[in-house]
Amino acid sequence: MKLALTFLLILMILPLMTGEKTSDDLELRGVESLRAIFRDRRCSDNIGATCSDRFDCCGSMCCIGGQCVVTFAECS
């Protein structure tokens, strides 16, 4: 049972840690993404989607003015 739970947890965390490195806080973003999953929050990849913070928007998008927008600079 413990082995199955460990395997499931690894499968959940692995996609959060893979991908292109765009900043030094990759590990922190992975942890925050995992917290969002446990809170049942999902990010939106739609431009103009309503958001309340930067974790509501996926990828290189930031939450500016309550909407997800594409940015080239890191979100603040």
From Swiss-Prot:
Record organism: Conus imperialis (Imperial cone)
Cellular localization per UniProt: Secreted
Record GO terms (molecular function): toxin activity
This protein's domain notes: The cysteine framework is XI (C-C-CC-CC-C-C).
Disulfide feature: C43-C58, C51-C63, C57-C68, C62-C75
Membership in a protein family: Belongs to the conotoxin I1 superfamily.
Keywords of the record: Cleavage on pair of basic residues, Disulfide bond, Neurotoxin, Secreted, Signal, Toxin
Protein name, as recorded: Conotoxin Im11.8
Segment forming the signal sequence: 1-19
Chain's role: Probable neurotoxin.
GO CC, alphabetical: extracellular region
Domain of life where this protein originates: Eukaryota
Predominant cellular place of this UniProt entry's protein: secreted
Propeptide: 20-42
Tissue expression profile of the protein: Expressed by the venom duct.
Key word Metal-binding present: no
